[in-house]
Amino acid sequence: DRQDPIADIVYTFEGGTNNVVFSWTGPNLNGVNAVIPSGTNSLVISGTPSVNITATTQYPYQVITDGSACSPEIVYTGVIEVKPEELLVLASAPATENQTICAGTGTNTLEPIIYNLEQEAISAVVSFTPALPGIGYTLTSSQVIISGVAQAAAQASTTIRTFLYEVETTGCGPARESGTITILPTPVMSLYAGDENQPSVCNNSPIEPIDYIFNPQSGATFSITWDQ
């Protein structure tokens, strides 16, 4: 992982040499250096990779003794392999990342939320806060798919409930993406005051007021129709 330090690689030199030379034999690995600590006969390769890569990349190097009393010089070679930071990319429509839906199989159900696994990501997990009954996820070789039908247990009777989901890859990085799924309550309306079935009234005379209350949190509006 290019964000994690490598384990130190230490070479010691002795005998007929008092120095070694380090070099990259391929591309330089930024963030990783080789030094000989003062007063020692050791070469230490250490650091944290800092490179812009989208696939696993190998960085070969060599260490050669220098100025030895006898030849030939000794050559050691090695490779440091760096994996890219994994990436999650929303593949479904932008509007799917945060949705407001209803419970049950009626209208306004969840449209699948799909993230592509990129830059060598091969797995991910999805968590819901709080738990969201009826909604889960599936994992393919290249995608994470959040889908399902919100159960009635996810729905409050009169208030809106919001659930946070987070997608996290399991490898380098890791990559994280999040969004919300909001569950509307079911529509509720009840008679508050007055008589639904009014007694006969004379023309041009007022009726007794009839009051209904409903829950606007469900997103419902009202309309009046007259039965002829």
Stretches found by the model and what they are:
Residues V21-L43, V125-I145, T221-Q228:
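Low-complexity "stalk/linker" and mucin-like segments enriched in Ser/Thr/Pro/Ala/Gly
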Residues V44-T54, I145-S157:
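Extracellular/luminal low-complexity segments enriched in Ser/Thr/Pro
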Residues D4-T12, G106-Y115, S205-F214:
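A short beta-strand segment in extracellular, disulfide-stabilized domains
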Residues A55-S68, S157-G171, Y212:
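A short beta-strand micro-motif common to beta-rich folds, especially ectodomain repeats
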Residues C70-E85, G173-T186:
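C-terminal edge beta-strand
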